[in-house]
Amino acid sequence: MNQEIFEKVKKIVVEQLEVDPDKVTPDATFAEDLGADSLDTVELVMALEEEFDIEIPDEVAETIDTVGKAVEHIESK
């Protein structure tokens, strides 16, 4: 896992979800572990798209349920 991408994703997750940075691990799930609801998830995807200048289609966004999966998707772009 690219550490630089992970750190950027972590920063965005902490800002968007207002969670403790220590809780943001590659295995942390957005809904269960970090308390994101559906609106939080949409806003998080939009923030990631803007930060990394990518587009994440809705059908892909629905499968990204952990911090690690978000990083992997961004790495693949």
Swiss-Prot record:
Disulfide bonds: none
Keyword Metal-binding carried by entry: no
Highest taxon listed in the record's lineage: Bacteria
SUPFAM superfamilies tied to this protein: ACP-like
GO MF term list: acyl binding; acyl carrier activity
InterPro entries per UniProt: ACP (IPR003231), ACP-like_sf (IPR036736), PP-bd_ACP (IPR009081), Ppantetheine_attach_site (IPR006162)
Main localisation: cytoplasm
Annotated compartments: Cytoplasm
GO terms under biological process: lipid A biosynthetic process
Pathway: Lipid metabolism; fatty acid biosynthesis
PROSITE patterns recorded: CARRIER (PS50075), PHOSPHOPANTETHEINE (PS00012)
O-(pantetheine 4'-phosphoryl)serine modification, residue list: S38
Stored NCBIfam families: acyl_carrier, PRK00982.1-2, PRK00982.1-3, PRK00982.1-4, PRK00982.1-5
Family per similarity comment: Belongs to the acyl carrier protein (ACP) family.
HAMAP family, sorted: Acyl_carrier
Record-given protein name: Acyl carrier protein
Species this chain originates from: Synechocystis sp. (strain ATCC 27184 / PCC 6803 / Kazusa)
Upper taxonomic lineage: Bacteria, Bacillati, Cyanobacteriota, Cyanophyceae, Synechococcales
